[in-house]
């Protein structure tokens, strides 16, 4: 009878160990489920907010058009911009104003220069200032060049009378600034989600059309901690060509 009792005792021991193992597995599974539920509850609002937000509302500097013209000795660039005032890369968007910025590169900077042009039936003009560091003339006025395909600029440089027929660098395939930003958000979903809280986007966005032979978009995400996450996009597809963080 003793061997039988030993076998029964062994069976009971194995049974209890099996039950204990099952219980541990069940509690482990419950723990995993709870952790997953907590993670979903924490991140879901952020992801949802990132999907619903219109990040274009956080653009605090916009360059939507670039027009260029050049001769053998001169080159002219005109930008359609919207900028906040006062201008500060501090991660906070402020009220913006539309401006036309005109840059003139000349053989020398020792002559007085005046520029005149017309857009939307309105005439604009004035004396251009000279930047000794950039070695170019500059003029800014409250005007909208965002939809202009061509603009004639009349420049008086010293005793010379110059006419520049400036043409936009945009092509039929060039994305609008808003669509370009949407493309970036699609490609950088995790980054945008990490920079979004229950109040919205935690910074400001610089969005500039640029031209280096071909049109591109520069996008800068500026947060309040001073970090700048910069992207170079193909203007016709929104594809990220380069990126860096400073």
Regions found by a protein language model. Name each.
Residues 146-160:
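Short, aromatic- and glycine-rich surface loops/edge beta-strands on solvent-exposed regions
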Residues 48-107:
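Extracellular ectodomain segments of secreted/surface proteins
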Residues 139-143, 197-235, 244:
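Exposed beta-strand-loop-beta-strand "reactive/processing" segments of non-cytosolic proteins
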Residues 160-171, 231, 243-244:
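Edge beta-strands of extracellular beta-sandwich domains
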Residues 1-58:
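Gram-positive cell-envelope targeting signals
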Residues 124-140:
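Aromatic sugar-binding surface patches on proteins
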Residues 99-123, 167-210:
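Short, non-transmembrane alpha-helical segments in secretory-pathway proteins
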């Amino acid at each position: 009878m003793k061997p039988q009792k030993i076998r029964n005792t062994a069976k009971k021991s194995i049974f209890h160990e099996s039950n204990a193992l099952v219980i541990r597995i069940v509690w482990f599974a419950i723990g995993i489920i709870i952790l997953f539920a907590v993670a979903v509850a924490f991140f879901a609002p952020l992801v949802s907010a990132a999907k619903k937000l219109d990040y274009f509302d956080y653009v605090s500097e916009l360059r939507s058009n670039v027009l260029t013209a050049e001769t053998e000795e001169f080159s002219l660039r005109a930008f359609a911009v919207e900028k906040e005032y006062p201008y500060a890369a501090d991660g906070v968007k402020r009220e913006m104003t539309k401006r036309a910025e005109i840059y003139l590169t000349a053989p020398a900077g020792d002559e007085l220069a005046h520029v005149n042009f017309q857009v939307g039936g309105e005439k604009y003009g004035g004396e251009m200032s000279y930047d000794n560091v950039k070695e170019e003339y500059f003029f800014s006025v409250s005007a909208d060049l965002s939809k202009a395909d061509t603009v004639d600029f009349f420049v008086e440089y010293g005793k010379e009378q110059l006419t520049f027929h400036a043409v936009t660098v945009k092509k039929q395939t060039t994305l609008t600034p808003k669509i370009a930003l949407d493309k970036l958000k699609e490609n950088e979903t995790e980054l945008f989600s990490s920079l979004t809280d229950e109040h919205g986007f935690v910074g400001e966005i610089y969005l500039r059309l640029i031209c280096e032979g071909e049109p591109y978009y520069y996008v800068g995400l500026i947060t309040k901690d001073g970090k700048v996450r910069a992207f170079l996009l193909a203007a016709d597809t929104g594809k990220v060509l380069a990126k860096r963080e400073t």
